[in-house]
Design a protein with these regions (language model features):
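Structural cue for short, hydrophobic secondary-structure segments
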Residues: 42-45, 68
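Flexible "cap/lid" subdomain of the alpha/beta-hydrolase fold that forms the substrate-access gate
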Residues: 2-20, 25-29, 36-39, 52, ...
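Active-site glycine-rich loops that stabilize anionic/oxyanionic intermediates
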Residues: 37, 45-48
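Short amphipathic alpha-helix adjacent to the substrate-entry channel of hydrolases
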Residues: 51-68
Length: 272
């Protein structure tokens, strides 16, 4: 049985209300909801939370019921203790969270947009729950297995955190916790191609969450899962294809667009 607690208006996104939704699996997810119409879920990446969508959510809410969850381990959602196999933060587990969230909100089918980590959750979501997803968009990602398989010096240098965060506990946790603001600032500045794209207000919100040791550990577990159990799950589903219409977006100056054939790699994973 899921439960829902109203948490007031969003201080970052006009017209959106905050809710804490306790899912059937016991996890509590913080979510911002606004607008009306067909349901559209926006899944954020690392190191952000749902507020990363603050500039586009109000416009999308003119035609959709827009649902902005904090992924498990991120923002103000629960950060459960992980397991040795990292299954707690596998994309399969995180995708199940989203389906349970939509069940709790009363939506049987929905579209979603996933950026970065959210896109990887979305990939598994589209594979495991094809009857629930009407269409989907991935922003700035190639398939996880492809990116690992084609890793070279350029990718490893630009995406250093992929290899730092997967180191055994407590190495990355200890180093990040020593100065979360420094790590977060360097991480974000290394990704930005447009100066000022992340405002000071947004940075402060991300830092508020990043200063929580439980979130630091959860983020590391998210990446550890990506390098282990997620690859195992993908290998077991090599013949599976995304059945719903898939839209791909990426930045022309970004690493993914420069290093990978984005459309070509996803054509191998999707039917549409």
């Amino acid at each position: 049985m899921s439960t829902l607690i109203e948490c007031g208006a969003s201080p970052f996104i006009p017209g959106f209300a905050l809710k804490d939704v306790r899912l059937e699996n016991g996890l509590t997810v913080r979510v911002a909801i606004g607008g009306s119409g067909s349901p559209l879920v926006l899944l954020h990446g690392h190191p952000q939370n749902h507020t990363t969508w603050r500039k586009v959510a109000p416009t999308l809410a003119q035609n959709h019921t827009v649902i902005l969850p904090d992924l498990r381990g991120y923002g103000d959602s629960d950060k459960p203790t992980s397991d040795p196999a990292h299954r707690t933060y596998s994309k399969r587990t995180m995708a199940q969270d989203i389906v349970m969230l939509m069940d709790a909100l009363g939506f049987s089918r929905f579209a979603f947009v996933g950026h970065d980590r959210g896109g990887r959750v979305g990939h598994r979501l589209a594979l495991d729950y094809p009857d629930r997803v009407t269409c989907c968009t991935f922003i700035d990602i190639a398939p996880t297995a492809t990116m690992y398989a084609l890793t070279d010096k350029s990718f490893a240098t630009r995406y250093f955190w992929w290899f730092f965060l997967i180191q055994p506990f407590p190495l990355p946790e200890t180093m990040i916790a020593h100065d979360p603001a420094f790590f977060l600032r360097k991480h974000i500045s290394g990704q930005l191609k447009i100066e000022g794209a992340t405002s000071q207000e947004a940075f402060n919100e991300y830092l508020r969450c990043y200063q929580n040791p439980e979130m630091i550990h959860a983020i590391c577990e998210d990446y550890r899962a990506a390098a282990t159990i997620d690859l195992d799950d993908d290998a077991a589903d090599t013949s599976a294809r995304i059945r719903c219409p898939l839209q791909l977006l990426w930045g022309g100056l970004g690493t993914v667009g420069q290093l990978y054939n984005v459309v070509g790699t996803w054509k191998e994973k999707a039917l549409n």
